[in-house]
Amino acid sequence: MAASELMIERSSIEISLSDIAQKSGANAALVKYHFGNKDGLLLALLERNAATELSNLEYLLAQPITATAKLKLHIGGIIRAYYRFPYMNRLIHYLLHETSAGSADEVSKFFVAPLLDFHRRLLAEGESSGEFRKTDPVLFYTSLIGACDHLFFGRHAMSRATGVGPVTDEVCRQYIRHMETLICGGILTQAGEAAAAG
């Protein structure tokens, strides 16, 4: 979708309907007619991105592997999703806080609530198997999603301060390993550490 490409190119969610129309080759009036307004288009884009990513969560939860293995796969999946859609958290914040209550309710319904529910179920599975310490799902969500957002959005501040470059495939892989170590080091029990090791 042209809107997604523009936000990635510009590292910003500040795009206009005319920018989107020009990028897509469509008429701006047609874009407005189909989505209602820019916020409608952004909501549809986020819903499309979220549907793809969230459908994988049910599949992951059903797999016959340890909760620790599921956790690691989830960490990698979330980071890769942010790598593909680096504007995602900014778009979520915009739609939750700077648009209508209806848009905020929709984002909560199709993104925040299902992801939190997945975290609750995964953490409960790990706790009941003895792999995880008791972990608050809201704090877990905040930690993982916040860390992902900062890598992609906060990268601009880091590049100015330290000279680091853009997020590449290698940086993404390093960050996945780092977050696995950080999160697993915080919530795994000895049984969970044994499951992670082998």
Where are these regions (language model features)?
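Helix-turn-helix
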Residues: 6-40, 44
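Short coil/turn segments at alpha/beta junctions that flank glycine-rich nucleotide-binding fingerprints
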Residues: 9-13, 64, 85, 129
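C-terminal peripheral helix-coil segments that are non-catalytic and often amphipathic
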Residues: 80, 84, 113-129, 133, ...
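Short hydrophobic clusters on alpha-helical segments that form packing/core surfaces
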Residues: 2-7, 183
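Short secondary-structure transition hinges
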Residues: 55, 80-118, 139, 165-172
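Hydrophobic/aromatic residues within well-ordered alpha-helical segments
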Residues: 38, 45, 49, 53, ...
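Hydrophobic alpha-helical connector segments
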Residues: 44, 58-88, 137-144, 173-176, ...
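An amphipathic alpha-helix adjacent to DNA-recognition modules
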Residues: 1, 13-14, 34-58, 72
